[in-house]
Swiss-Prot record:
S-S bonds: none
Enzyme class per UniProt: transferase
Gene: ipaH9.8
Name this protein carries in UniProt: E3 ubiquitin-protein ligase ipaH9.8
Active-site residues, Swiss-Prot/TrEMBL: C337 (glycyl thioester intermediate)
The NEL domain, residue ranges: 253-545
Species per Swiss-Prot/TrEMBL record: Shigella boydii serotype 18 (strain CDC 3083-94 / BS512)
Summary of the function given for this chain in its UniProt record: Effector E3 ubiquitin ligase that interferes with host's ubiquitination pathway and modulates the acute inflammatory responses, thus facilitating bacterial colonization within the host cell. Interacts with IKBKG (NEMO) and TNIP1 (ABIN-1), a ubiquitin-binding adapter protein, which results in TNIP1-dependent 'Lys-27'-linked polyubiquitination of IKBKG. Consequently, polyubiquitinated IKBKG undergoes proteasome-dependent degradation, which perturbs NF-kappa-B activation during bacterial infection. Mediates polyubiquitination of host U2AF1, leading to its proteasomal degradation.
Length: 545
C-alpha cells in the first residue's frame, strides 16, 4: 500500500517547480475534496494515491475499499484502469477518454456517465442502476448483475461476455451476428423475461445464452424447443429452467415448516426441539425448501412420503453434523422449479445414508453397505451421463436432465434415494434410447469398476477403521512404506517418460496419480480380504443384479 501523505509536495528546484505548476490545478482540487470528507471516508489515502498516480504517470488508479461517498471531478487523464469498487459512491465523475477498464462494483450508483470510447471492460455489478448509457463499440466484457435495469441498449458487436443476472429486464436485446466470429456467453438469469426474440437464433452455435428463472411463457418454451430440436439447427446453446421466475422468497419460522410434516399429537414437542435451530446457517432456506417439498408430485402422489420426511427430520434433529450438511445441500433448492426441489430431496437422502454408513449403521451388515455403495456408484455414473447429455443439447434445463436419468431409471437400477415421479420430464431432452444406453453403461461400468470404487469409498474406510482396526493399521503401514521407498522414483520415472522433468505442475499431477494408484492397490487388497471373510460368513454376494 502506498504511504499516506496528506501534504504531498515536490522538491523545490526549477524542474519540479515546472511540474508542480502543471499539476497545481489537480492538487488544489484534490486537497479541497479531501477537506470535505465525511466521517469514515479515507480521502487522505485516496488523495495520496491520486497524486502518486499523476506524478508517476501510472495507467492504473485503484481507489477501492476506501468508503468514499464521491470522487473528485478531475481524475488523472492518462489512466486506462480505474477501480473504485466497494465504496459508497452514488455517481461517477466524467471519465478519462483513455479509460479501458472500469471497476465500480458494490456501490450505490443509480446511473453512469458517458462511457469512454475505448472502454473494453465494464464491471458495475451490485449497484442501483436503472438504465445504461450507450455502450462503446470496443466493449468486450460487461457485468451489470444485481441492479434494477429494465432494458438494455444495443449491444456492441465485440461484446463476448455479458452478465445481467438479477435485474428487472423484461426482454432481451436484439442479436445480430452475420459472419461475426465472436464466441459469446450471455447471462440473463433471474429477470422478468417472458419471451425470446427470434434474433437469438442469429448467434453462432458456439455461443451460450443463460435465461434460467425467468417467467417464460409455455408458448415461448415450446417454440424454442421445437426450433432447437431441428436437425439443421445451428444457433446458440440456450440454458433455461422450468421456473416462473417468481418463487416466493418469504419463509415461515423453521419450527413451523418442520412441524407441518408431523401428526398433530407430536407437533408441540417437535416445535420445541426445532426452535433451537432457527439461527443456524441456511435455516431460512431450509424452511422454504420444506414448504416447496410438500408441493412436489412425489409428496402428492407417493404413499408414506410424509412419514418418510418426518422420520428424516427426526434424524436431523439428533445430529448437528447431519443437520449442517443437509441445510447446506438444500440452500439453493427453492430458487428454481419443482423438479429442482425433487432433485435436492434425492441428494438429501443420499447425504443421510452416507452419514449413517460413516457413523456405523452398517458395521455389522456388510451386504447392506455394499448395496448402498452400489447405489451411490450408479448415481455417480448417471451424473456423468447427464453431464455429457447436457453438452449435446441446444435448449437445456440441466436440472431436468439430471433428474430425468435418476427418476426414469430408479426402478431398473434400484435407486432407493430417487423420487419416482417428476413434473417436467417432457422438456428434459432425455429420450427412451438415452435411458436404455444409460442403463447399459451403468451396468457395464459397475461390472468393471465397482470393486475399485468401493475400496476407496469413505464410508467403507470408516467401517474398516472401527471393525478391522488391525488390518487397517497394517494397510496404512504398507501404504506409507511404499510411499517412502517407491514414491519419489515412480514420480521421477513418470516425469522423465513424458519429458516433463522439472515441471512443478506436472510433478504435482504425477504425484497425485502415483498416490491414487498406491492407495488403489493396497485398499483393494484389504477390501478383497475383508469381503471374502464377511460375505462367506453370511452368504451375501459382491455381485448384484
Amino acid at each position: 500500500m502506498l504511504p499516506i501523505n496528506n501534504n504531498f509536495s515536490l522538491p523545490q528546484n526549477s524542474f519540479y517547480n515546472t511540474i508542480s505548476g502543471t499539476y497545481a490545478d489537480y492538487f488544489s482540487a484534490w486537497d479541497k475534496w479531501e477537506k470535505q470528507a465525511l466521517p469514515g471516508e479515507e480521502r487522505d489515502e485516496a488523495v495520496s494515491r491520486l497524486k502518486e498516480c499523476l506524478i508517476n504517470n501510472s495507467d492504473e488508479l485503484r481507489l477501492d475499499r476506501l468508503n468514499l461517498s464521491s470522487l473528485p471531478d478531475n481524475l488523472p487523464a492518462q489512466i486506462t484502469l480505474l477501480n473504485v469498487s466497494y465504496n459508497q459512491l452514488t455517481n461517477l465523475p466524467e471519465l478519462p477518454v483513455t479509460l479501458k477498464k472500469l471497476y465500480s462494483a458494490s456501490n450505490k450508483l443509480s446511473e453512469l456517465p458517458v462511457l469512454p470510447p475505448a472502454l473494453e471492460s465494464l464491471q458495475v455489478q451490485h449497484n442501483e442502476l436503472e438504465n445504461l448509457p450507450a455502450l462503446p463499440d470496443s466493449l468486450l466484457t460487461m457485468n451489470i448483475s444485481y441492479n434494477e435495469i429494465v432494458s438494455l441498449p444495443s449491444l456492441p458487436q465485440a461484446l463476448k461476455n455479458l452478465r445481467a443476472t438479477r435485474n428487472f429486464l423484461t426482454e432481451l436485446p436484439a442479436f445480430s451476428e452475420g459472419n461475426n466470429p465472436v464466441v459469446r456467453e450471455y447471462f440473463f438469469d433471474r429477470n422478468q423475461i417472458s419471451h425470446i426474440p427470434e434474433s437469438i437464433l442469429n448467434l453462432r452455435n458456439e455461443c451460450s445464452i443463460h435465461i434460467s428463472d425467468n417467467p417464460l411463457s409455455s408458448h415461448a418454451l415450446q417454440a424454442l424447443q421445437r426450433l432447437t430440436s431441428s436437425p439443421d439447427y445451428h444457433g446458440p446453446r440456450i440454458y433455461f429452467s422450468m421456473s416462473d421466475g417468481q418463487q416466493n422468497t418469504l419463509h415461515r419460522p423453521l419450527a413451523d415448516a418442520v412441524t407441518a410434516w408431523f401428526p398433530e399429537n407430536k407437533q408441540s414437542d417437535v416445535s420445541q426441539i426445532w426452535h433451537a435451530f432457527e439461527h443456524e446457517e441456511h435455516a431460512n432456506t431450509f424452511s422454504a425448501f420444506l414448504d416447496r417439498l410438500s408441493d412436489t408430485v412425489s409428496a402428492r402422489n407417493t404413499s408414506g412420503f410424509r412419514e418418510q420426511v418426518a422420520a428424516w427430520l427426526e434424524k436431523l434433529s439428533a445430529s448437528a453434523e447431519l443437520r449442517q450438511q443437509s441445510f447446506a445441500v438444500a440452500a439453493d433448492a427453492t430458487e428454481s422449479c419443482e423438479d429442482r426441489v425433487a432433485l435436492t430431496w434425492n441428494n438429501l437422502r443420499k447425504t443421510l445414508l452416507v452419514h449413517q454408513a460413516s457413523e456405523g449403521l452398517f458395521d455389522n451388515d456388510t451386504g447392506a453397505l455394499l448395496s448402498l455403495g452400489r447405489e451411490m456408484f450408479r448415481l455417480e455414473i448417471l451424473e456423468d451421463i447427464a453431464r455429457d447429455k447436457v453438452r449435446t443439447l441446444h435448449f437445456v434445463d440441466e436440472i431436468e436432465v439430471y433428474l430425468a436419468f435418476q427418476t426414469m431409471l430408479a426402478e431398473k437400477l434400484q435407486l432407493s434415494t430417487a423420487v419416482k415421479e417428476m413434473r417436467f420430464y417432457g422438456v428434459s431432452g432425455v429420450t427412451a434410447n438415452d435411458l436404455r444406453t444409460a442403463e447399459a453403461m451403468v451396468r457395464s461400468r459397475e461390472e468393471n469398476e465397482f470393486k475399485d470404487w468401493f475400496s476407496l469409498w469413505g464410508p467403507w474406510h470408516a467401517v474398516l477403521k472401527r471393525t478391522e482396526a488391525d488390518r487397517w493399521a497394517q494397510a496404512e503401514e504398507q501404504k506409507y512404506e511404499m510411499l517412502e521407498n517407491e514414491y519419489p522414483q515412480r514420480v521421477a520415472d513418470r516425469l522423465k517418460a513424458s519429458g516433463l522433468s522439472g515441471d512443478a505442475d506436472a510433478e504435482r499431477e504425477a504425484g497425485a496419480q502415483v498416490m491414487r494408484e498406491t492407495e488403489q492397490l493396497i485398499y483393494r487388497q484389504l477390501t478383497d480380504e475383508v469381503l471374502a471373510l464377511r460375505l462367506s460368513e453370511n452368504g451375501s454376494q459382491l455381485h448384484h443384479s
